[in-house]
Amino acid sequence: RQVAEVADVVELGVPFSDPMADGVTIQEASRAALADGVTLDWILDLVAGLDLGTPVVLMSYLNPLLTRSHGELASQAKAAGVDGFIVPDLPYEESGPMRQALVPSDLALVQLVTPLTPPARRRRLAGASSGFLYAVRRTGTDGRERARRHRRRRRRRTRGLRRRAA
């Protein structure tokens, strides 16, 4: 219950073997989670055992969700205590079947907008989004800039070590 005091919503990521929109950190976390046997079913079981007092949404690429029908996904997610989904690689124009399957279970399908989303499309996505609208801070992969800074720092340290060794 303490989570509800500091968070409006909890986002849990479903690992995927090819997280193309994610940066190095999340890619490595996905690989490690998959290697440890984390699956959509594992995450649903985890959520079912939690009592956070705040909504839980699953961030997932579409492929892991397609291991079952949209209707099965909705009923299993609702039974586990999930409140919605963020599916970054599911374009709004193709989201109708999933959205329709989630509505009877009162599950949200959160849409994403970026700084480059045209205003008319942003309004359309805001109207179609349920739960909340996910505003991506910048375009590109998550964690890219942080990873770049980390590599630069590592190179500087390595150069310093090479100079001392010479």
Q: Which positions does each model-derived feature cover?
A:
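Glycine-rich phosphate-binding active-site loops on the catalytic face of alpha/beta enzymes
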Residues: V9-P19, A80-I86, P91-E94, Y134-R144, ...
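N-terminal small/glycine-rich loop or linker at the start of catalytic domains
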Residues: G23-A29, L50-M59
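Active-site cofactor/substrate anionic-group-binding motifs, chiefly glycine-
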Residues: A4-F16, A29-L40
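A structural motif corresponding to the C-terminal end of an alpha-helix
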Residues: V6, D45-V56, A80
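Active-site mouth loops of central-metabolism enzymes
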Residues: R1, P55-S69, A108-T117, E145, ...
